[in-house]
Regions:
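Juxtamembrane/disordered regions of integral membrane proteins
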Residues: 2-158
């Protein structure tokens, strides 16, 4: 007879699950900051609406699809951070994971957003063609994303 041992996958024993949960929570935190900074500045830089519009155009599902795409993007970034950036960072210097998360957020916004996405969309480097507030808005959003990412990933170790 063959014994098959089953193992329950939980937040505590699965890096993958922990990284996915971290990506979801970090994206939700990003969204909270996004809608707060939109309300404060009046600059309509809603990434979910933009992603939805670029994907399906104007429809009743634009916002929902945009949020799903943004959530999947956040999960993908969490997996990149957890499996690639974090192991590399730990070899360089030992800092709290939440610090690595915030550094990841800064690097991500500079490379992918300021010099990638925004110029490709015609918004200029760092989105300065939209409004002077855009660089700070996007920087704060991504630092919060990285902070929450680091907090959730390091939570298991406590």
């Amino acid at each position: 007879m063959v014994n098959i041992e089953t193992k329950q996958i939980t937040l505590k024993n699965s890096k993958f699950v922990r990284f996915v949960i971290a990506g979801v929570l970090a994206t939700l935190a990003f969204n909270a900051v996004m809608y707060t900074d939109i309300a404060i500045t009046g600059v309509p830089l809603d990434i979910a609406a933009l992603m939805g519009e670029l994907t399906v155009g104007e429809s009743e599902f634009t916002q929902s699809i945009g949020h799903i795409i943004h959530l999947v993007n956040g999960i993908g970034l969490a997996l990149l951070f957890g499996y690639v950036a974090l192991p590399i960072s730990k070899r360089i210097k030992t800092l709290p994971i939440l610090v690595y998360g915030m550094i990841f957020g800064v690097i991500e916004v500079i490379i992918a957003v300021w010099f990638g996405m925004l110029p490709l969309l015609g918004a200029g480097i760092a989105g300065l063609n939209i409004a002077p507030e855009v660089p700070l808005m996007t920087l704060v959003r991504h630092i919060v994303f990285g902070l929450v990412l680091g907090l959730v990933i390091s939570w298991r170790k406590r």
